Amino acid sequence: MSDGRTGAGEHDARTAALDRLVARMVGAGPLRFTVAEGDDERDLAYRLRHDAVLSRGWASADELDGGREHDAFDPAAVHVLGWDGTTAVCAGRLVLPPGPLPTEEACELVVEPRGQVVDVGRMVVAPSHQDANHGTFVLLLGGLYLEVRRRGFGVACGMMSAPVRAMCRQLGCRVELLGPDRPYWHEVRAPVRFEVGRDAAGLVERWGDDEELSER
């Protein structure tokens, strides 16, 4: 098992190639990704989450906070926003160590390596940008991946539904199940762990081109 935080000596060619591949994929897409700065941009993430919860029937408006969905982890979290022009259309959240992380708290477990894991969650896409191919959601995953890597981490965890786990498998990305499915954030999800270096070679072979392969 590798350390969660990756230094220069551990940032091997395969992982670097995957980082470049994801950066190119996200950069070629129609969205721009940023980290929310200030209360106004955080509020955009909370409102996107609110709208997602309502549209899926997970909660009623009376159960939510004035058009916002948020919890105790949000003030210290990193919120990643995806923009279509000047409109925020998707969002996700990173809760940084040392923890306890949301997944650890919900499932009463510790994700190893302790204190070196980023919790990825609260991923939502505006109804206007949802489609059968889940293109915006895949780009959001890429934007969150890049932010995790930018902060020097190589291991992530989260609560993931069975359909999203299946999507990850189709993309060639293995997620390690840490426990059984259970109700979490209005849906049945299971705790999972993802290690960057584990699948880097296979992902680059599958989705990369000659540039990535030659630079490995």
Give residue spans per PLM region:
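A short, polar/charged loop-to-alpha-helix boundary motif
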Residues: 60, 97-110
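Conserved beta-strand in the GNAT
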Residues: 81, 86-96
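Short acidic N-proximal helix/loop "leader" segments that mark the beginning
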Residues: 1-28
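Charge-rich, low-complexity intrinsically disordered segments
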Residues: 187-216
